[in-house]
């Protein structure tokens, strides 16, 4: 059945560039939207710049331009970067729009009419030089707990303490440097606590991931406080109706920005806002967000919608944050990489794929390990997928004038087998289990490459008597390539576009059951260039010179390595260190000698969720045939390593010592492939 679906991503703030951390969310959302479109659903994906607030007002002042000029420029920059990464919005709007003014004020009026708004005086910090009330983050001073200087007005980045700006020692305005004054002002509050019973039920209704719902439960233990939804002039934002000099706090008008973008799109496409947001709408609405804003989307937003008579979202999907090389993105380490910096060096499809391999339906941080990124992108996309087309296309054009065979003959069953996991892969996409989908697709790529190796078209091409067999084999190979490209198309839109142009066919998920037969294709041209290490290295910006290497400073002497026997071993590691190693039970499904290698065996390991290719230095102790079917233990999250003989995707565990070895580790009976060793 065709579904009507509205999809949103969180609104990026119009005060800075898009960076790779942002792109986790927009890539996740875009993949999901593309998959829904691929399955024929009526899917609309909207987003917008979050374009109001004090930081935008102050930055515009510092640049000598108006806030409107700043947000117009940032909107263009953001949309350019999103487009560069293949993010396909149906509309990219702004919260500084007529629709958002109207909708935000309408929601407020409905909440006030229902007695969910109260007004009272509060005391605030005021900058007498700049003439503005200061948000907590615009006050700096000495932490009252640890004494660290130059800390924010609400929290210390050194010791993690939270406090009131009035607790800061020697506070100053970050805007003018003046000492803030304490002044009273009348503020408007949304009575969030009135919705406590409703929210307790709603967050466990299946709309949120269960771990998110449990996190939100913590707020009820201390009680839901009234939410301050007003700010005083001067302020760049939406005026509060019938309240001169008062403006909505940025989150009050950012959340309705989803509705405003929908309304703008509807007006251009003959639809009505009520088709999506009306209380009786049958449409599905899904918000993709980061884990840092679940409070606003899981409590404030549903309460605002409920109190103003609108329908609620169908699903809210939170994701984790991005780290680079195992650490938080950092300007000082050069790992705070913007989208624009990336696009200057590398094809965005590699990053889209890598993000997809890491994502699942849970709220887990993902790491961009640049060495793994290089090996996996080249190994999977170029080595396993694109090379299939380049290997087969030459034979088709040299021997068959670019025309595929009229039948798959005896290999029809092999092709049909490739489609057996198609629906499971589709279910993984739908469930946001992208990592599983990528593993299953790469397992298919391994099958097709094994088919090519077994049938050796380069050998068939030398024998005129095998002309028909050659035609069949390369036709099967190119149809297998089409399967891979179709399954990967939500993740790799540009590669799939080029590949389908080469194959002269349309993107058709359901049409894979009918292979391309007696079909003309174009001559092959490069679809995806390999990444070079120098390109990946160029992503890391040079950090500021450290004192040890600054001009005129002597470098510290390099310590002489200590032999392993003389090195004092640390007898302990923490449980956190051990838990980083993902040990899995694996079944050896194939074992072969490696040509040109004296010590290595090539193992294919079943780890439950797919297979891994591993090169192990155990040839001196084991006959390959004796290993097939045996269970062992592998390190499953070791970064892939490019070797002369191929890509090794993990490590099997073995013991050795003066008495001999290596001896493979084996689990007790009952263990199954994929089980984790804890």
Curated annotation (Swiss-Prot):
The residue range of the signal peptide is none
Q: Return the motif ranges for 'KMSKS' region.
A: 328-332
Predominant location = cytoplasm
Spell out the Pfam families in the cross-references: Anticodon_3, tRNA-synt_1g, tRNA_bind
Task: Report the cofactors.
Answer: Zn(2+)
Binding sites annotated in the UniProt record for Zn(2+): 143, 146, 156, 159
EC assignment: the record states 6.1.1.10
Domain tRNA-binding stretches? 577-678
Specify the domain of life of the species encoding this protein.
Bacteria
Keyword hit for Aminoacyl-tRNA synthetase: yes
GO term, biological process aspect, one: methionyl-tRNA aminoacylation
Which GO molecular function annotation, any one, does this entry have?
methionine-tRNA ligase activity
Could you tell me the keywords of this UniProt record?
Answer: Aminoacyl-tRNA synthetase, ATP-binding, Cytoplasm, Ligase, Metal-binding, Nucleotide-binding, Protein biosynthesis, RNA-binding, tRNA-binding, Zinc
Sequence positions that bind ATP: 331
Gene Ontology cellular component annotations, sorted alphabetically: cytosol
What does the subunit comment say?
Homodimer.
Instruction: Kindly give the HAMAP family that the UniProt entry links to this protein.
Output: Met_tRNA_synth_type1
Known function:
Is required not only for elongation of protein synthesis but also for the initiation of all mRNA translation through initiator tRNA(fMet) aminoacylation.
Family of this protein: Belongs to the class-I aminoacyl-tRNA synthetase family. MetG type 1 subfamily.
Any idea what this protein is called?
A: Methionine--tRNA ligase
The species is Acidithiobacillus ferrooxidans (strain ATCC 23270 / DSM 14882 / CIP 104768 / NCIMB 8455) (Ferrobacillus ferrooxidans (strain ATCC 23270))
């Amino acid at each position: 059945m065709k579904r009507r679906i509205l999809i949103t991503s969180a609104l990026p703030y119009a005060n800075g560039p898009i960076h790779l951390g942002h792109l986790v969310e927009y890539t996740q959302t875009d993949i999901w939207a593309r998959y829904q479109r691929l399955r024929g659903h009526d899917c609309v994906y909207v987003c917008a710049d979050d374009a109001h607030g004090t930081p935008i007002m102050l930055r515009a002042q510092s640049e000598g331009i108006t806030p409107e000029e700043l947000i117009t420029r940032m909107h263009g920059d953001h949309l350019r970067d999103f487009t560069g990464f293949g993010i396909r919005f149906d509309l990219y709007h702004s919260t500084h729009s007529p629709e958002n003014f109207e909708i935000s004020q309408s929601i407020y009026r409905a909440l006030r009419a229902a007695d969910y708004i109260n007004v009272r005086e509060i005391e605030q910090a005021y900058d007498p030089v700049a003439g503005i009330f200061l948000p907590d983050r615009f006050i700096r001073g000495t932490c009252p707990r640890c004494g660290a200087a130059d800390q924010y007005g609400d929290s210390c980045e050194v010791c993690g303490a939270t406090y009131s700006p009035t607790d800061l020692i020697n506070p100053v305005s970050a805007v003018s440097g003046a000492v803030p004054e304490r002044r009273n002002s009348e503020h408007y509050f949304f009575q969030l606590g009135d919705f406590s019973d409703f929210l307790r039920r709603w967050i466990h209704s299946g709309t949120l991931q269960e771990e998110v719902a449990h996190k939100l439960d913590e707020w009820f233990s201390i009680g839901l406080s009234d939410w301050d939804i007003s700010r005083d002039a001067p302020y760049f934002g939406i005026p509060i109706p019938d309240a001169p000099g008062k403006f909505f706090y940025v989150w009050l008008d950012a959340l309705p920005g989803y509705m405003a973008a929908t309304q703008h799109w509807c007006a251009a496409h003959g639809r009505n806002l009520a088709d999506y947001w009306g209380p009786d709408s049958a449409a599905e609405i899904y918000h993709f967000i980061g884990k840092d804003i679940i409070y606003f989307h899981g409590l404030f937003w549903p309460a605002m919608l409920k109190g103003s008579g609108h329908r609620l979202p169908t699903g809210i999907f939170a994701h984790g944050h991005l780290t680079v090389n195992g650490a938080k993105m950092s300007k000082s380490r050069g790992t705070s990489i913007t989208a624009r910096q990336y696009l200057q060096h590398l094809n965005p499809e590699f990053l889209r794929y890598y993000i997809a391999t890491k994502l699942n339906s849970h709220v887990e941080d993902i790491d961009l390990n640049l060495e793994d990124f290089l090996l996996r992108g080249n190994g999977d996309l170029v080595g396993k997928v694109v090379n299939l087309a380049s290997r087969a296309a030459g034979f088709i054009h040299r021997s068959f004038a670019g025309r595929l065979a009229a039948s798959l003959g005896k290999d029809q069953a092999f092709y049909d087998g490739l489609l057996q996991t198609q629906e499971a892969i589709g279910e993984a996409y739908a469930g946001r289990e992208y990592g599983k989908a990528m593993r299953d697709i790469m397992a298919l790529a391994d099958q097709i490459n094994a088919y090519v190796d077994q049938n050796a078209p380069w050998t068939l091409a030398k024998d005129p008597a095998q002309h028909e067999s050659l035609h069949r084999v390369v036709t099967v190979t190119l149809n297998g390539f089409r399967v891979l490209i179709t399954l990967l198309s939500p993740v790799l839109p540009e590669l799939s576009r080029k590949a389908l142009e080469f194959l002269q066919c349309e993107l058709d998920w359901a049409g894979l059951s009918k292979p391309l037969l007696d079909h003309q294709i174009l001559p092959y041209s490069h679809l995806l260039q390999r990444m070079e290490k120098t390109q990946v290295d160029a992503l890391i910006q040079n950090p500021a010179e450290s004192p040890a290497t600054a001009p005129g400073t002597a470098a510290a002497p390099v310590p002489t390595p200590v032999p392993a026997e003389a090195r004092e071993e640390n007898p302990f590691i923490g449980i956190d260190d051990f838990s980083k190693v993902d040990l899995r039970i694996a079944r050896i499904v194939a074992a072969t000698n490696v040509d040109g290698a004296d010590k290595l065996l090539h193992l294919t390991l079943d780890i439950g969720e797919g297979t891994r290719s591993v090169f192990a230095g155990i040839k001196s102790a084991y006959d390959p045939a004796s290993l097939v079917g045996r269970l062992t233990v592998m390190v499953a999250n070791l970064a892939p390593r490019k070797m002369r003989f191929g890509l090794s995707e993990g490590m099997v565990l073995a013991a050795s010592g003066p008495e001999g070895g290596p001896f493979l580790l084996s689990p007790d009976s009952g263990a199954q492939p994929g089980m984790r060793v804890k």
